[in-house]
Amino acid sequence: MLLTPPRECGGCAAKADPSLVAHVVRHARVGQRPANELIGLREADDAAVQRMCDDVALVTTVDGFPPPIEDPSDYGAIAAANAVADVYAMGAEVQTALCFLAFPRETDPAYLGAIMRSAAQVVADCGGAVVGGHTVHSAAGVFSLSVTGLVHPDRVWAATGAQPGDALVLSKPLGTGLAISAHQPGSFESAIAIMRETVQAAATDLHTMRRAPSAVTDVSGYGLLGHLKEMTRAGGIAMCIDASSVPVAPGARRLASIGVRTGAHETNLEYVRKSLTGQPSDDDLAILLDPQTSGGLLAAVAPDEIPDSFVRIGTVVAATDNESTLVVST
């Protein structure tokens, strides 16, 4: 038996909606904030960061999802690439990973082995190692990884901190969620290749910049607009996006034009609706709200220093009010 992929809500399209996540997180805020905590629940960033000593901070994160595809090697590799992205988004280097694998009793052991083998290879390629994990029998299949990284405490990146005048840049095309949902030849294979690629090289490019990025995150289940909204949490800024400049995966625009949507489309739209201004078309919204599994890095950088592995998609401006923080032009 193989794990059946729920394509319309597999991968990061299965991510719980932001209001539910906020509710759950509120109940986890127990006790005092640790003295060495740099980033934690209150910041709601891509990973937690704790200062271990003057020169070292520990980055920890966990991520996983139901299978978006049938091939176990692709599933494991994509899940690992997706999980390490959170470490890279904090400016850290991957160290170790723990794996959690839930599966029905009838699942072929060879299938499970292929998931683990490909995931472990991705972690190793990033300079880390899978050092343990846990397995349980479950009615539904889920694979996730908890990844640790190390970074200097003074060089941690965060999702907030973008400044007016910064350029908004993206390292991967959007639309893989649409391609997985449609499962059409050509676009499907292209999406697999995009999702298997880690953001390690993109993070390295950001590290080589003369001026550190003002803000960095990765595009995941809430789509580009959802993660841009999260970058505005500190207030005072708005994100102006040129929809025509956004890189799109092969075939994704055609899929959007024929009405393909993922299971996360409506919840992602609801999340950003009050913040959104401009006149994006329905097809543009399908791309901009598309949940990404192993999506690219999204960064706010100096406009005169855009790394080669990134595409400029917009500009950070001063906010004119507290609500209209996402401006989309076409």
Give the location of each predicted region:
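Glycine-rich anion-binding loops of enzyme active sites
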Residues: 52-60, 64-69, 74-77, 93-183, ...
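A generic local secondary-structure boundary/capping motif
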Residues: 37-39, 47-50, 85-88, 120, ...
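Short glycine/serine/threonine-biased micro-segments
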Residues: 8-9, 38-40, 74, 89, ...
